[in-house]
Regions:
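Conserved GNAT acetyl-CoA-binding A-motif
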Residues: 136-148
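Conserved active-site alpha-helix within GNAT-family acetyltransferase domains
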Residues: 126, 150-168, 174
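Conserved N-terminal entry element of GNAT/NAT acetyltransferase domains
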Residues: 18-46, 177
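Acetyl-CoA-dependent GNAT
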Residues: 36-106, 111, 116, 129-131, ...
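Active-site acidic-Proline motif in GNAT/NAT acetyltransferases
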Residues: 116-118, 122, 150-151
Length: 177
């Protein structure tokens, strides 16, 4: 039987309405006791495309829906590593680790971390961050950076608990679209 993806935390169900999985996560106690598994994804599967359709809007309302081709571009380059986190086989979080070989050394950057709203606070984000830190260290990266809006208070606390420190730096951006 195919169940809609549904996570229930503190009695508050969050449903995406999709029929993308045959597993249903329910109950804050069950979620807390489940193990989080992380893995690097190297190809654009239906499951990953569907996970982005569900998760990416929770990160950015302006992000465009990713199709197989777009996910393939993300996973098809040696500088990118797409990490996913699963609970009971269901993808509940993603993180993009970008490695940049520079004249000053290999640098790593974490981008687009998103954990399903109902799975937040249960170790999913930390599992993704820890996996990314390990991969970057194993690759010989000198540093690993990420940016996060100040309004994402819980995420910022997570990053600080994981060892990230705020830098005295200014981020500049030019909109190209």
């Amino acid at each position: 039987m195919i169940w809609p993806t549904s996570l229930v935390v503190s009695g508050d169900p969050i449903r995406d309405g999709s029929q993308s999985t045959d597993r249903q996560l329910a109950g804050a106690d069950r979620l807390r006791s489940m193990s989080v598994e992380t893995e690097a994804v190297r190809e654009a599967t239906d499951e990953v495309v569907e996970a982005f359709a569900r998760l990416l809007p929770q990160l950015s309302t302006k992000a465009k829906r990713l199709d197989h081709e777009a996910v393939g571009r993300l996973t098809g380059t040696s500088t990118n590593t797409l990490l996913v986190a699963r609970v009971e086989g269901v993808i509940v979080g993603t993180l993009m680790l970008v490695m940049s070989p520079l004249p000053s050394g290999l640098r790593a950057h974490i981008e687009d971390v998103v954990v399903d709203a109902a799975a937040r606070g249960h170790g999913v984000g930390r599992a993704l961050i820890d996996k990314a830190l390990g991969l970057a260290a194993d690759a010989g990266a000198r540093t690993i950076d990420l940016t996060s809006r100040p309004s994402r208070e819980a995420a910022n606390r997570l990053y600080e608990r994981a060892g990230f420190r705020r830098r005295e730096s200014t981020v500049y951006r030019v909109a190209l679209d």
